[in-house]
Amino acid sequence: LWGAWLHVDVINPGTVLATPDDLTAAAWARQHLPEDALVLVNSTHWTNTARRGSDAGWWLPLLGSCAVTLPNALYIQGGRQRFDEANQLAIAVEEAFDLCAPDLLRQLASRGVTHVYVGAAGGPLTPARLDACRAYVPLYVYGPTRFYAFSPESVASR
């Protein structure tokens, strides 16, 4: 037990989801995103049935004062329908081969997604994948962080 005290300040880098670049992006979000914005965020598998954020997007409700598609860990306690809907959308994005696929764009639009965030820690939503589709319009770029407006109409107007 004595040796454990020597490691009390050791931080697992895999658990650090918010970097200084993310904090700057969150400050931008507080000033520029509309109050009713719903931000699509990166996610990954967590427990048997739950997902978790894979970057600072998961913390945007606290850091950036905006709603996100995957609420914090307590979303498990928010009712079965809310839990299932959050998981279904997260899994659809995680497993998407093409972020511009019509079915995915329809699903994002039907859930009310207005913006997308890519944090420094990353996940399945990457700048390269989002930049390849006109439905995701870059609004903010700072280091590895990005905010996009979600505009599925831009794809339909090709």
Residues covered by each model-derived region:
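Extracytoplasmic
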Residues: L1-R158
